[in-house]
Every structure is written in C-alpha cells, then in structure tokens.
C-alpha cells in the first residue's frame, strides 16, 4: 500500500516517496511533505538547471545553489527561472 502525504507543493493528498531521497533534515522534510508527482516535477527542473547553468555537483557552491532552488520550488511555491527557456505553448 502506498504511503500518502499532504504534498505541500501541490497542496493536496498524494502518494508519498518510497524512501528518503535526500540526506539530513531537509531530506526528512521532503520525505514527510512532498509527493512523488511534485518530486518528479522538481527532478525535471533540477536537470534543466544543472544543464543550462553548467552546474558541477562536485562544487559545494553549485550544490548549495541547487538546494536553495529545490527548497524554493518545493516549499515556497517559487518557480525555477532558467535563462532562455520558453515553455512550449499549449495548443488551444
């Protein structure tokens, strides 16, 4: 049976993550308050950030920047801004 959480990002009940994917207190907060769907949305944004900003995960400053962006996206409702990216237009 899937674990259910009240996802803070989506503001609804959602399937919870299967295990803690991020270390420390922030990882516990994500595990307790973020659903699989929201985590998937973050992973897409994270990949775009790493690629477009050429982040190096061996660099402490780059990891700190990415963690700040993750917190802003998942818990504060701030979208990730990526220079030059224009979302595809929705067909009407």
UniProtKB/Swiss-Prot annotation:
Keywords: Iron. GO terms for molecular function: iron ion binding. NCBIfam families: PRK05408.1. GO terms for biological process: cellular response to oxidative stress. It comes from the Bacteria. It comes from Shewanella frigidimarina (strain NCIMB 400). Belongs to the Fe(2+)-trafficking protein family. Gene3D superfamilies: Fe(II) trafficking protein YggX. GO terms for cellular component: cytosol. The keyword Plastid does not apply. It holds the Pfam family Iron_traffic. Could be a mediator in iron transactions between iron acquisition and iron-requiring processes, such as synthesis and/or repair of Fe-S clusters in biosynthetic enzymes. This is Probable Fe(2+)-trafficking protein.
